[in-house]
């Protein structure tokens, strides 16, 4: 997977990624979503496999970014059921330490690769998606 990219050219990934911008301003655009600017952080960006996208922080503010990549039948079912949709890749959730702590736990879990680490990571992804959906639509 090639994670580095040119903002002008964008990129395609072969996995989903859930990005949390905890603080800062920036822009996002994808094949299914028009260019959108946002301020103040507290945003999830969900990237879809095989879909062109580009995003960047504002040069004036920068941003704090956390991300996790994933694939599998569970997420494919959620997308197939329209629970998650490439036309709605942004989730305005605000700033939450709990979300940041889940990303930090995912990083430690991936680095340590202890018994059951993939199941733990899958659980963390489901929790993060649950936060996105719950906070946005309640």
Name each region found by the language model.
Residues 78-138:
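Amphipathic alpha-helical segments enriched in hydrophobic/aromatic residues interleaved with Lys/Arg
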Residues 1-86:
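N-terminal regulatory/effector-sensing and dimerization cores
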């Amino acid at each position: 997977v090639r994670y580095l990219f040119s903002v002008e050219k964008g990129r395609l990934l072969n996995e989903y990624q859930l990005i949390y911008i905890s603080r800062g301003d920036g822009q996002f655009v994808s094949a299914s979503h028009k260019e959108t600017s946002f301020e103040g952080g507290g945003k999830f960006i969900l990237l879809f496999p095989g879909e062109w996208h580009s995003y960047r922080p504002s040069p004036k503010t920068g941003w704090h970014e956390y991300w996790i990549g994933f694939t599998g039948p569970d997420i494919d079912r959620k997308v197939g059921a329209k629970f998650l949709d490439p036309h709605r890749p942004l989730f305005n959730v605000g700033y939450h330490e709990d979300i940041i702590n889940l990303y930090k736990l995912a990083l430690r879990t991936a680095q340590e690769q202890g018994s059951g680490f993939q199941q733990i990571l899958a659980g963390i992804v489901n929790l993060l998606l649950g936060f996105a959906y719950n906070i946005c639509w309640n």
